[in-house]
Structures are given as structure tokens and as C-alpha cells.
């Protein structure tokens, strides 16, 4: 089994919706690896040396290589593939939607509303991911070195806050990060009013947008 490849970036191309292929030249041979869009944005320009952690899969007798930025990202991809009904496309979509620690926390907390923001991931699949992986990821994230995220809003409040922020056009990653900041840095109680969570989250998101500009 190929654990990782270290080589020169020969090219990156989008070959379809949410499908990115990295061509990596290793010792004179070119390897095509499907990678998350998030990784594609992080990679250096063509000609630079990189290390990519890999997952090898044979589908319909066709060998496929998937590439990831870290062993933890690859391991989480494998955990997702172990869930009934989850294929590589859905697993990569989930990895692209949230940062690794946020995705792990969303699964452990059974935060279906966040998970269904990933393209091609419906409510039933999201619920199955939470059901089948929660116990595994509670243990796995310790060995992976992920922080234990704060709870954020209480479950009854969380869904309403998320749906409001999604309706305003914010992404799952932006919403997850904003709620973490509001809970951790501002110290808003998890049972505070919905309006307070929304107000504080929008304030943080607006300030972040101003900084980026």
C-alpha cells in the first residue's frame, strides 16, 4: 500500500463538479490523485516539491489514488468511507465543507444541519455518519491531537441560529468558526437567546469580512 508520495507538482485540474486532479511527478513517473479542493488551494505552484498522503482504492476494477494534506485528513476520509452509503465524492465534499476539527466535532455532536451543507450529502446520509462514527471519532480525535471544541448554543437553539446564518449566505465553515469564537472568546452562555447568538455571530463575521478587505 502507498502511504504517501513526495514529488513535484506537475499540474492541477478541475475535471468536474467538486473533482480536482493533482498530477504529481515522482522519480520520473506521473501519478494522478484526486484531492479535496481545500488542498488544491493550499498547494504551491507547479514545479515545487510536496508530500501528499494517499489512499488507494479499486472501484469497478479501476485503481484510484486519493491525496490528502495530512495523515489525519486521510484517516478521517477512511472513516467516512466506512459508513454505509458514503462514497468518495461525499467524503471529499464533507472534508471540503469544514476544517478537520470542526467536521469531527459536528459528527460527534450529531450536527446534521452543518453536515448537509456539503454538496451531495442529504439528511439521511448525515444522520448515518453521526450514528456510525460518533463513538469512533471520540477516541480517534484524541490520538489525532484535535482540540475539544466548546459546545456552542444549546441543541434547540443551534439549529435556528445556523439556519438563519445559512440563509444570510454564510458558509458552514464560517458559521462553525463564528459560533466557536462567540462561545469561547466572548463567553456567551449556551442557553442565551437565539437573537443574542445571531447578533454576536454576525458581528464577528462582519468584522472578519472588513479585515479581509
Curated annotation (Swiss-Prot):
Q: Which GO terms describe its molecular function?
A: ATP binding; four-way junction DNA binding; four-way junction helicase activity
Q: Where is this region: Domain I?
A: 1-69
Keyword Transferase annotated? no
Q: Which parts of the sequence are annotated with region: Flexible linker?
A: 149-158
Cite the residue spans of the region called Domain III: 158-213
Disulfide bridge map: none
| Top-level taxon of the source organism | Bacteria
CDD domains reported for this sequence: UBA_RuvA_C
Q: Does the keyword Electron transport apply?
A: no
Which family does this protein fall into?
Belongs to the RuvA family.
Q: How does it assemble?
A: Homotetramer. Forms an RuvA(8)-RuvB(12)-Holliday junction (HJ) complex. HJ DNA is sandwiched between 2 RuvA tetramers; dsDNA enters through RuvA and exits via RuvB. An RuvB hexamer assembles on each DNA strand where it exits the tetramer. Each RuvB hexamer is contacted by two RuvA subunits (via domain III) on 2 adjacent RuvB subunits; this complex drives branch migration. In the full resolvosome a probable DNA-RuvA(4)-RuvB(12)-RuvC(2) complex forms which resolves the HJ.
Q: Read off the domain note.
A: Has three domains with a flexible linker between the domains II and III and assumes an 'L' shape. Domain III is highly mobile and contacts RuvB.
- NCBIfam families (UniProt xref): ruvA (TIGR00084)
What is the protein named?
Holliday junction branch migration complex subunit RuvA
Amino acid at each position: 500500500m502507498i502511504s504517501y508520495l513526495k514529488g513535484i507538482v506537475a499540474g492541477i485540474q478541475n475535471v468536474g463538479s467538486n473533482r480536482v486532479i493533482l498530477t504529481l511527478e515522482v522519480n520520473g513517473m506521473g501519478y494522478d490523485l484526486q484531492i479535496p479542493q481545500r488542498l488544491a488551494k493550499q498547494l504551491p505552484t507547479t514545479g515545487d516539491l510536496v508530500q501528499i498522503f494517499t489512499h488507494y482504492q479499486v472501484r469497478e476494477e479501476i485503481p484510484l489514488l486519493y491525496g490528502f494534506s495530512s495523515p489525519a485528513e486521510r484517516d478521517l476520509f477512511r472513516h467516512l468511507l466506512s459508513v454505509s452509503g458514503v462514497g468518495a465524492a461525499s467524503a471529499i465534499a464533507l472534508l471540503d465543507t469544514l476544517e478537520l476539527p470542526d467536521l469531527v466535532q459536528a459528527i460527534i455532536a450529531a450536527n446534521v444541519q452543518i453536515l448537509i451543507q456539503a454538496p451531495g450529502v442529504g439528511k439521511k446520509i448525515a444522520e448515518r455518519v453521526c450514528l456510525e462514527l460518533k463513538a469512533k471519532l471520540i477516541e480517534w480525535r484524541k490520538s489525532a491531537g484535535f482540540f475539544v471544541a466548546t459546545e456552542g448554543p444549546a441543541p434547540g437553539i443551534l439549529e435556528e441560529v445556523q439556519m438563519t446564518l445559512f440563509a444570510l449566505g454564510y458558509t458552514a465553515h464560517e458559521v462553525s468558526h463564528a459560533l466557536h469564537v462567540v462561545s469561547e472568546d466572548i463567553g456567551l452562555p449556551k442557553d442565551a437567546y437565539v437573537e443574542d447568538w445571531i447578533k454576536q455571530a454576525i458581528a464577528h463575521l462582519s468584522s472578519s469580512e472588513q479585515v479581509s478587505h
